[in-house]
Amino acid sequence: EYANVLFDVINYRWTQKLEEFNHSPRISQKVRGTDRENIRRKSLAKFRKYLDLENPDHVCFHTGRKIKYENLSIDHVLPWSYLFSDNLWNLVYVDKSFNSSKGNIIPKEETIEKLENRNIHLLKSMEIKFPNTKVTDELKLSIETDLIRKSWVGCK
């Protein structure tokens, strides 16, 4: 009679245990399809002031070409559909058309290295312009804990 409820509880507890050992965040939300339906994407516009510090000319992270303002988009390097989070350490400026065409692919290691280097440079600027803020602290922690690489490995 309670088999479905019990099965859900066991799966949920199992994913909590996995999250203790696995650096891939939100495993339970990935395992349960219903969680995904309830998650809504938020506007990334609040990150522009930070991204502008390191990339004031709005050069596409992937193509290296300057982006016209009307074609400027903020993108997750590691797909949002894998991490379900909007963190500065994973966000870059891209051309809208490129962003639409790339889909939810897991990036190559060279892209991860480029993002890691970008974050180091961005952190230096943020520590001067936005010291002691939550966003700066999160970026610093992501670098110190190698979060990009761990998340990338978890997505693969």
Question: What are these regions, as identified by a protein language model?
Answer:
Residues 1-59:
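Short, charged surface segments at domain edges that flank catalytic/cofactor-binding sites
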Residues 96-156:
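C-terminal structured domain segments
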Residues 62-93, 102-114:
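Histidine-centered nuclease catalytic patch
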Residues 4, 11, 22, 38, ...:
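Detector for Asparagine
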Residues 14, 47-51, 67, 114-118, ...:
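Generic hydrophobic, helix-prone segments enriched in Leu/Val/Ile
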